[in-house]
């Protein structure tokens, strides 16, 4: 099937990921017994990983792209800590750190593979190992497995039969990153990803930064509600 005939663009995927993430975090903070909300939320992370991989491939300014992720990762940390019931902790870091590490690994691997000299290819394995271990050490959301999931989407984006490879890779991710069987519902994220047409959809600076800001703003609001209202 021609990708251009598929119904979902990048904007649609972003909105779907945001809505499912919001439902997930509402379940985590306000309605801890509503397991269905956590199940719905399993779709969010794979879609975000896919979007980061697409962003890495199409951005015209890698430094600015990485800087945005870094700035919002730092800004999100206080709200993320509050969502976990503390004002400050270094025990667990928010998901934007995972996505940032994933993006950096993708670019290093891409650079290493396009290099003609052997020494240029060697950093690929090192970048993957460092990205994985750093995410594990920092205890970012989804850890090193999340970094590898971003890389999987990035490296297979032009591969024949990519949807099958991505589905299998996502299944391995679900098995490795969590003992909870509900994590397997993340496989459903491949349905909207399979319907992606490669187009950006409506975009603009305000909307772009609004998507980034949504993460710290919504978890801060939910955290305050959980602490002082519910």
Residue ranges and their predicted role:
Residues 1-230:
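Alpha-helical transmembrane segments and their immediate juxtamembrane cytosolic regions
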């Amino acid at each position: 099937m021609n990708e251009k005939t598929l119904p979902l663009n990048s904007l649609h995927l972003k909105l779907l990921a945001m809505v499912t993430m919001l439902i997930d975090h509402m379940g985590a903070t306000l309605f801890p017994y509503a397991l269905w909300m956590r199940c719905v939320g399993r779709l969010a992370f794979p879609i975000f990983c896919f979007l980061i991989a697409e962003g890495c491939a199409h951005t015209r300014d890698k430094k600015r792209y990485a800087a945005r992720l870094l700035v919002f990762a730092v800004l999100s940390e206080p709200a993320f800590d509050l969502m976990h019931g503390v004002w400050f902790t270094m025990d667990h870091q928010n998901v934007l750190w995972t996505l940032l590490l994933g993006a950096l690994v993708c670019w290093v691997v891409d650079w290493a593979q396009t290099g003609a000299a052997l020494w240029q290819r060697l950093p690929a394995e090192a970048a993957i190992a460092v990205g994985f271990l750093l995410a594990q050490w920092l205890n970012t959301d989804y850890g090193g497995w999340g970094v590898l999931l971003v890389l999987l989407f990035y490296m297979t984006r032009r591969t024949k039969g990519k949807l099958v490879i991505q589905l299998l890779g996502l299944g391995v991710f679900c098995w490795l990153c969590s003992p909870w069987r509900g994590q397997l519902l993340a496989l459903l994220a491949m349905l909207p990803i399979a319907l992606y047409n490669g187009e950006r959809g409506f975009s603009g600076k305000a909307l772009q930064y609004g998507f980034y800001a949504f993460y710290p703003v919504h978890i801060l609001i939910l955290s305050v509600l959980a602490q002082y209202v519910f």
